[in-house]
Amino acid sequence: MSEDLKRSASDIQDELAQSPKRVKFNDPPQIDDVNKYDANNVNANANVNANANVNANANDSNSNNFASIASNVTTNPIDFTVTQPQPVSPEIQNPITTLLQTDPGVGASKDLLTTNGSAINITKNADTNNIETNTASINPVSNTNTNTKPASVDTVDIKSVSANTADTATDTKPVSADNADTATDTKPVSADTADTADTDADAKPASANTSNTTNANTAGTGASNTDVANSSSATTSTGDAKPQVQGANETGSNQHDQRDSSKLNDAIAAAGVDIQKEEELLQQRQLNRKPGAPSEKQDGSKSQTQVPLLNPYHLSAFLAKVSKTHQIHQNFLEDGNLLNLISDACEDWLSHIASKALILSRHRRRGTQFSLKKGGLSSLTQLSQQRSAVSKELRNLALRQKEMEEKRVQKRIVLGLEKSSGNGTDDAANGKPGSEETLHRAANATAAMMATGKKKYSWMSSGGGGAGSIGSLGDDARGSGVGIGGGGVGGGDSKTKQSAILSARGDNGLRYRDLRSTNAIVLKDLLNALEGEKKGTQHAITKGYAKLRD
């Protein structure tokens, strides 16, 4: 308490007589003045629980009510014990002393404030840590108890809570004037700090008639909290708290928006529009706008990049080489579309040539059609015996040549020009390469060649019979007219003659190779396919036929 606010007891009585609405004890009165009040006529029961239910029962027999007395508790949780008033020393001159002592246990109700025998019972719930107090009307009387003590200065100016806010407050804490600047979740605020203290946005708005810390209805006799609640229906916000009117406006705007959206949905449903399908279509169109995204025709399948047939680097080098001969200088690597076009054209042309070569290969390998007969060979055997027409024609030619050769050799044997294969073994022994006669003849031939230096043919040294027969044949032909066969054929040594061709050729004289058809395209088929093309194929055809082997 500051010393500059001390007043005398007479000033306090005058203020009580003039303005019963507000009593402010800046300095406690003297003990003699306090004895004028009868504390036995004051029954103040303030039962405040954690659920913010305010029950105030005040029996007022006098016509004047003075200010509410409340106790603010800022610490959480704190239990208080009631102590008896202690004698006051004359130096302090403060007869009103409230001793607060912290109770470590959480339990039943405690008497927090005592005014010389008249106690204000404050009930503290064991489950909660918040304490709320309600105002109680104290009726000043005369000449009874001398131990009545008014409340301390720090707890005098407390707003009374209206019924509207008291029933809805849940986690509230009364805040004293000293701690008004630091309190956050506060509901009632003292009048001394109403102009300066900044409350939090969560603070509940106080009633409009409580700006002076007392209800306007306390002037009349028998006023209760119910009358205060009825008269203080209009509310205003304290500090930075938002007014309730703004919240009501926001709620109304939200309801209006909900009604508009519901009407819009009803209109869309009545028109037969499927919102889900429209959203899917819009999303698909957005995906199609992105580069590389699949189109609608592909049904979401990923587009595959085609690899060109010809390598762009080698193709551009070849084009640059050809264009350089025509005095055209161009970098074909920069024009990728041109390279792709040429590559696609080459691929189409090569596919055309390959198709023609395949058709020619099938015609070349096509065999003679066989008709199946009853009791004949199985179809598998007949298919294995199928040959091409060219192969069959070659076989027929070989057989005819063999027959002609056999007839010719047979005629030579009849004429005695060749030795028959059915003669005795002596002739075979004489003509044996390892016999003495053969070696002797070979030695004579070698000596003759060394001496004369000329080769002596066999018809010159085959015997005098052969040569003499020819000469005698001429003489005899002139004189006697002997036939040719006597000296020439009969007189000659026909046993020494042997057909070397038949011995080398074997039985038939020609080796036959059966050409089976194969599922492949050969060089001849490609050359035949290129012959149908007119431009740019002559040089390739010439090289192809040069490499073709029979």
UniProtKB/Swiss-Prot annotation:
<dbReference type="InterPro" id="IPR007900">
    <property type="entry name" value="TAF4_C"/>
</dbReference>
<protein>
    <recommendedName>
        <fullName>Transcription initiation factor TFIID subunit 4</fullName>
    </recommendedName>
</protein>
<dbReference type="Pfam" id="PF05236">
    <property type="entry name" value="TAF4"/>
</dbReference>
<feature type="region of interest" description="Disordered">
    <location>
        <begin position="1"/>
        <end position="29"/>
    </location>
</feature>
<feature type="domain" description="Histone-fold">
    <location>
        <begin position="316"/>
        <end position="396"/>
    </location>
</feature>
<feature type="region of interest" description="Disordered">
    <location>
        <begin position="165"/>
        <end position="262"/>
    </location>
</feature>
<feature type="compositionally biased region" description="Polar residues">
    <location>
        <begin position="227"/>
        <end position="239"/>
    </location>
</feature>
<feature type="compositionally biased region" description="Polar residues">
    <location>
        <begin position="246"/>
        <end position="255"/>
    </location>
</feature>
<keyword id="KW-0804">Transcription</keyword>
<feature type="region of interest" description="Disordered">
    <location>
        <begin position="287"/>
        <end position="307"/>
    </location>
</feature>
<dbReference type="GO" id="GO:0006352">
    <property type="term" value="P:DNA-templated transcription initiation"/>
</dbReference>
<dbReference type="GO" id="GO:0005669">
    <property type="term" value="C:transcription factor TFIID complex"/>
</dbReference>
<keyword id="KW-0175">Coiled coil</keyword>
<feature type="coiled-coil region">
    <location>
        <begin position="380"/>
        <end position="412"/>
    </location>
</feature>
<keyword id="KW-0539">Nucleus</keyword>
<feature type="compositionally biased region" description="Low complexity">
    <location>
        <begin position="206"/>
        <end position="226"/>
    </location>
</feature>
<keyword id="KW-0805">Transcription regulation</keyword>
<feature type="compositionally biased region" description="Polar residues">
    <location>
        <begin position="165"/>
        <end position="187"/>
    </location>
</feature>
<comment type="similarity">
    <text>Belongs to the TAF4 family.</text>
</comment>
<comment type="function">
    <text>Functions as a component of the DNA-binding general transcription factor complex TFIID. Binding of TFIID to a promoter (with or without TATA element) is the initial step in pre-initiation complex (PIC) formation. TFIID plays a key role in the regulation of gene expression by RNA polymerase II through different activities such as transcription activator interaction, core promoter recognition and selectivity, TFIIA and TFIIB interaction, chromatin modification (histone acetylation by TAF1), facilitation of DNA opening and initiation of transcription.</text>
</comment>
<comment type="subunit">
    <text>The 1.2 MDa TFIID complex is composed of TATA binding protein (TBP) and the 14 TBP-associated factors.</text>
</comment>
